[in-house]
Amino acid sequence: MLQPPDEHAHADVAVEAWWWWAASADGSQGAFVGFELRGRRFDYWAGFVRAGEPYLYIEELDGTGLRDGLEIKPPEMWADHVCDVAFQQWSLGNEAHGVLLDDPEEAWRRAHGTVVPVTFDIEWYASGEPTEIAHGYEQRGEVDAQIELTEGIVAFTGPASRVHVWGVPFMPSSFAMPVATTGLRAPYRRNDGTRIDQVLTDRWWANVIGPAVS
């Protein structure tokens, strides 16, 4: 049975991962945040997609600068992930420089794009009880999100989901590339070069594993 301490880091595991996904009510924009902890080192990803706009991508792989809880302060950025009420509410934030990618697949390579300052301020609220999965749990919710860009603040509310696993990294279950030809793409790369493709479709976020970057 899940207990409130399960929301936080487990000291006896080699790896632990927290992931959140969100979309606006009309599906025209969405965001994600991923955080994977390995001892005192970590990987961090965040992204924001909008119809007709470049993909905004943030990554910090094999980072250092872990503070108390799930707060991180590597060079040139800050992020925090705060459990306000166990299984009910999380607060996610960052202050970083992201890259705007006209070609989302550039995130699989060197992520060359236009560098821009960005701030995420996301409140995640549960809309149901967590469901146990292998090595952790998943949960549905909703968000109140504000993404601050150079042109101003983009705000949206809408459905959300999250996953928390420990003892293993979070990896999508499929090894086939997405068949969706429409949607907002938000791919990312893991620190071992594995490509993960994510697409915000009219049904929800889909994410699958692709081949490692050569």
Predicted regions and their residues:
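Targeting-peptide/extracellular-domain and disordered-appendage signature
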Residues: M1-S214
